Every structure is written in C-alpha cells, then in structure tokens.
C-alpha cells in the first residue's frame, strides 16, 4: 500500500487512507 493524497483516503476509508493494489489512486 502507498500513502497517497485525498483520493486514497476517499477510496480506502477502511485502510485509513492506505492505497491497495486494487485501488485506483
């Protein structure tokens, strides 16, 4: 996971803003 900007936090709320491989950030 990658700590991205606001887009990641909105997409992965459960992961505390952590971007997963399947998440589009």
Curated annotation (Swiss-Prot):
Subcellular location: Secreted, Cell wall
UniProt keywords, alphabetically: Antibiotic, Antimicrobial, Cell wall, Fungicide, Plant defense, Secreted
One BP annotation, GO: defense response to bacterium
Tissue distribution of the protein: Distributed in the epidermal cell layer of leaves and in the subepidermal layer region of stems. Not in roots.
GO cellular component, one term: extracellular region
Primary site of residence: secreted
UniProt KW Secreted keyword: yes
UniProt keyword annotation of Transcription present: no
Family to which this protein belongs: Belongs to the DEFL family. Group IV subfamily.
Entry function: Antimicrobial peptide. Active against Fusarium spp., Gram-positive and Gram-negative bacterial pathogens.
Protein name according to UniProt: Defensin D3
Organism from which the protein derives: Spinacia oleracea (Spinach)
